[in-house]
Amino acid sequence: MSNERFIPDPAQAALFPDISGNTINGLGEVMARRPRYVYWGNDPDEIAHGALQRWFYTVDPGLAAYADVRRARAEVLNAALGPLATDTDQIAPDDWHQFVARSVSVGDFDKAGVTAFDPQWAFEGVEIRQKNIIILGFQHQYDEIKKAPAPEGGLEVMRQYLRAARGAKIVASWLRGHGWDAEPLTGPMSGKVTMIPPALAAGFGELGKHGSVINPEFGASFRLSAVLTDCPLPVDVTADHGIDAFCANCRVCEAACPTDAIAPHKQTVRGVEKWYVDFDRCLPFFNEHQGCAICVAVCPWRRPGVGERLVLKLAKRAERLASDDDAAS
């Protein structure tokens, strides 16, 4: 629990709808269903919290670079994809892995994973025809994101969303050049698909207590974009690094949250027991600061190199506990 109690701006508080964002998200629902748009709606007029989404853009962060990055992202989003080749190439696994390695080396993205698309990941009312989804990761610069919730931290998030938009288009255009149609998806708008579940399925890591994916290399300090395609690429697998159990015993992000939005235990959301961040508590602070990312900035996994050492430490501990159990049986 944060020592300072956050009190929302009355002008913003007056815009909250009667329905809770947690209700829209399915908090407490025991039956599985698709997600519904709760924020970052493609059309604010079509979501209950649309007035709050519009209010977000009235806040002046005090940095001219915000507008510059937004303009640059708009240019990327409006740019045409590469042409679709008439002949379809069969992309060998080695060719895909070489493309990924080359793209990472030049900074187009920092990580990629592939998994079969699950229709449950699409928002209600959205039908996805493609069979596979490629998830791309874009790591924050540590020295910038650690400034959150200062405007510089939010600016770093925006820079990575710019990279995410560009990276998704690069991958989609590469696939189209091989004759495979591909559709790029990028934030911060919700788009067609919720990206965290496919990121978990594609081996990006595990869900953290703060509601973000924690990766051994990047911590939770990265953004996502995606590409939908029918191209039969080699799929990745989920990974258990002991992160979930670590979060159960860690209270760093929970204690740092200025709105007490991070719960100490898992909750049921649309039929799944998982870590969940209280939307109604999180949003006002997020809006008034043009973003937040405090939970990501304080996460023990955030520092470069720390996550990989933690994974090794947790693995050794698990082996030791398993040996003790064997000896006791």
Q: Model regions: which residues?
A:
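Catalytic cores of enzyme domains
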Residues: 101, 110-320
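Iron-sulfur (Fe-S) cluster-binding modules
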Residues: 1-116, 128-129, 301, 305-329
